[in-house]
Amino acid sequence: MANITAMALTPSKQLDASFALPDFALPDVVSGKTTIPADFAGSKALAVVFLCRHCPYVVHVMPTLLALAHEYLDAGAAFVGISANDAANYPDDSPQRLKDMVVSRRIPFPVLYDESQDTARAFHAACTPEFYVFDPERRLAYHGRFDASTPGNNVPCTGHDLRAALDAVLTGQPAPEPQHPSMGCNIKWK
């Protein structure tokens, strides 16, 4: 396991209840195809996950996130991952290395690369992993953590908080409160 003490633990920022899905046009690291929000039209919920390869907090949640994504994709939700880390200084987060991760882990949703970091700024993203759930009108319903588990705290990784938010949005209910901030490695800004 990576040395967690060497990582800068960063919380996500609180967003206003009126926050709506920002527009973006980013390349899929596997296909190279430009992905835009309209590609997820028709989904009952959209989960956006800021992630990377090297952060131990992302590595910690990834197996459970993949299982949860498979379950909720079948229920009508859509997922998209976005990596915005500066690949020049963090080559493990380059598009090619992200592609290797997507293929080897069989990630069931597109992972996009935000080279300019403009999309991360539009989302007010601060850390990896960081989770957003948008309703069918693409209004923010949830912004926060995956669950209470972190590397080394011995709390089982279940995806409880993200799961509760997705369940609420898929049934037309408001997401549960309180929404706890995500905690992870800071986005590696240029």
Language model features with spans:
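Chalcogenol-based redox active-site neighborhoods
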Residues: A2-Q179, N186-K190
